[in-house]
Amino acid sequence: MFDRFSAYQPQLLSVLRIVTGLLFVSHGTAKVLGFPAMEGLPPPGLSLAGLSGPLELILGTLFLIGLFTRPVAFLASGFAAVAYWMVHAGQGAFPILNGGELIALYCFVFLYFVAAGPGPWSVDAAMRKRA
């Protein structure tokens, strides 16, 4: 019954990349620009949030448009893993209890894109077509 959706797998891969990129960028804009405002964030600077904001903004934007997708996804996955262990793991054993479920999910979604690539709606795919 659901096999007919297999034909849309490449496009849905692009949709997943775009939505993930938008959400990741929003974390960066919250930390760097203060928009959208998030409670509990320290002011930007030499804090972990101050350093992670620009990374989320840059990596998220590149991931969103699908430029250098695999290396960007590799870096973002590693960044998410480090963030999980530095910020959340010490607060409890389970992600649902330590508030780390979102960053853990980002880590594995990015890791998936290292293997899967960006999908057809990406700058990478457009550059591949031109070559």
Model-derived segments and their meaning:
Residues M1-L33, L48-I58, I65-A131:
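Extended, low-polarity transmembrane helix blocks
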Residues E39-G50:
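Perimembrane loop-to-helix junctions flanking transmembrane segments
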Residues P36:
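Conserved catalytic-core motifs of eukaryotic protein kinase domains, centered on the activation segment
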